[in-house]
Amino acid sequence: MKIGIFPNMGKEALYTFWGKLISILQAKHIEYYVAEYARGGFESRDIAIDKDRYKSTNWMGKNLKYILSIGGDGSYLEAAKAFSDYSVILTGIHLGELGFLNSIRQSDVEERLDQIVSQKYVLEDRMFLSSCILHADGTRTFLPDVLNDIVIGRAQIGKMVRVNLYINDIFAQQY
């Protein structure tokens, strides 16, 4: 089995967890590759990773079935965007207190990898949503694509907001 690793290099916990993760992967004979952007961060910490293990997102998307995001939910979202054009299975290890998208705790990594290897998991379909703000003068402000949900809020309490919902450019509902 092969897996791609998409780490958040800004998370200090990554560096203390890294050795344990690699030991688990090696014990389970899981071949791993690391996103190319991570090279500088690992080298600056004197963490030796064979240069052939660093791969581009494009290479990983085309050659691997599984991608493991390591960090927080933001890291998961970045990985989801990076691999959105590829047919990969994305899961993640969260390095903080709570993870909604990166749902694997560090203490559960070995068990979860066993489930992945034996294909005893349930896939959860997620989708990217696009949104924009249509201003009164007709101009549009396009917002970044998001995963699964869009939260609509008001700048001022008590100010009315009207929302037109379109699905695939077809008007669905006004709120």
Protein language model annotation of sequence segments:
Residues 1-66, 107-122, 133-144:
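ATP/NTP phosphate-donor binding region
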Residues 10, 72-75, 98:
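Short glycine-rich anion-binding loops that position phosphate/pyrophosphate groups of nucleotides
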Residues 14-15, 74-80:
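Short glycine/serine/threonine-rich phosphate/pyrophosphate-binding segments
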Residues 19-24, 84-85, 166-168:
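Short, solvent-exposed amphipathic alpha-helical segments in soluble enzyme
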Residues 69:
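Redox-cofactor binding/interface segments in oxidoreductases and associated redox assembly factors
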Residues 78, 83-100:
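Gly/Ser-rich helix-loop-strand patches that form or flank binding pockets
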Residues 98-175:
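Catalytic core of DAGKc-family lipid kinases
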